[in-house]
Structure formats: structure tokens, C-alpha cells
């Protein structure tokens, strides 16, 4: 059994792997609902094992969830909501499960980028000197950008810490959100849907640098928790590192074609885990 936990970025994966006639959009667990993974009927040959999915939101608050999924208590240890604890403990104790894939949030870099819509900013990312500073943009020190991203990421990283703590038996794998699409691609997407989309008004290179910093911080943190991260599929990105138009659902989400590439990565990870368990 494969377990998959996340929110909106799950949809690309489910669009790619769900059996015909199977709703690909797994409803998010309601705030008044007991937590549970739901089995998803799959297309033949997409994944090497059955799949159970739970769609959550890190901001859940309700009787089953508590004030938050995870919070840092004043005395230091993690406070894990009862519903979330039950969800994870159930996965960890399922003897048929070897791997839990996790795709949480992903909009943190996007939210920070929106601050540049009215007041354009830029910053130097040392590992990408090709992404030069843009004229007319206020230059913000890297440590200031990183501190703001750390704030955006805080709740997600606490949630990942709880997952690692409650699922010690499982191989936990982080699925990163896709990189941003180019400004031109997002603008074209917005125009075809007759809706405003502010994201394309932030320069492509700035959004890409924010994503690279965000993904690097996330991967570094999860590595310390013994959580591996899937790479972004090379076929889906331009040489610069932005998401190709053929693989985008909107400015920040991948589509079913992107999801199919992620499914192939998941299948490889699960197959290796199954061989290792023999």
C-alpha cells in the first residue's frame, strides 16, 4: 500500500493515476470529520501498489484537529492535534505500507513574491549568478528574504517534523511543488481564463529565485529528518528552471502531464522499497 498526504498539489498526481470514472479530486478532510486515508482506484500499470490518499490543510482547526495540526508548545515539545496524530499513526502501523509521500502547501514562495507586485524587489542568489539583478528593482539582502521565507515555512516544517516523529517505520518522501512558470506562460494562462492573475506581474527570475531558495530550505530541513525529496522532473522544466507551459495547470500547480512524471518517480521509489523488503 502506498500512502499519499497533501493538499492542492495532489491533484496533478491523481489526475494522472486515477482510474477512468474515478474522481481525481479527493475532497479535503472536513474540519468536523474523523481523519482517514481513502483508497483511490488506479489506472492499470501506473503505480506498483494500491494507493490511499488524505487531502488535508495545515490550517485545520476543529474538534478532531485542535487549534492547529501541529504547534510548538511553550515548554518546547510539539503539540500534535489528536486527529492528525491518529491519521499518521494509522499509516505507520499499516503493515502493508512501506512509503508515505507528502506534498504540503507550496505557496510560501508565491506569497512572498506577491509582495513585489506593487513594490518590485530582487535579491542575489549566489548559486544562480545567471539570474542577474533587474533594473528598477529594490535589492533586498538574501538573509532578509530567507528570514521571511522561514516565517512562511514555519508551520509546514513543524508538520513535517510531526510526520517524521509519528511515522518512524515508513520511508517518508517529500514531493516538492513544481517551479514557477515563466511570466509569459502565466500571462497567457490568465488571459485564456478571463481572470486576473497577479503572479505574472512579478518577474520570472525573481519568482524562480524565491522558489529555488524555498525548495532548498525545505530539502535541507527534511534531510535532517531523514525525509528524502523527489527531484523536479527534468522533462518538465526549461533550461532556466521554469515550468514548461505544457506541464502547468496554472501559475503554481502542475497538470496531469506533470503528475504523470511524478507518478513515474513514485513508482520507482516504491518498487525499490518493495525489493528491499523481500
What annotation goes with each model-predicted range?
Residues 12-18, 23-126:
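Conserved SGNH/GDSL esterase-like catalytic core that processes O-acyl groups on lipids
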Residues 41-56, 61-67, 172-173, 231-252:
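Short flexible/disordered coil segments
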Residues 7:
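Active-site glycine-centered loops adjacent to acidic/histidine catalytic or metal-binding residues
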Residues 88-244:
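Alpha-helical cap/lid subdomain in secreted, periplasmic
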Residues 81, 150-153, 157, 256-267:
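Short, amphipathic alpha-helical "lid/cap" segments that border enzyme active or binding sites
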Residues 1-3:
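Extreme N-terminal starter segment of soluble prokaryotic enzymes
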Residues 10-14, 34, 156, 211-218, ...:
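Short, highly selective alpha-helical patches that border small-molecule cofactor pockets
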Residues 209, 213, 245-278:
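Histidine-centered active-site loop/cap adjacent to the catalytic His
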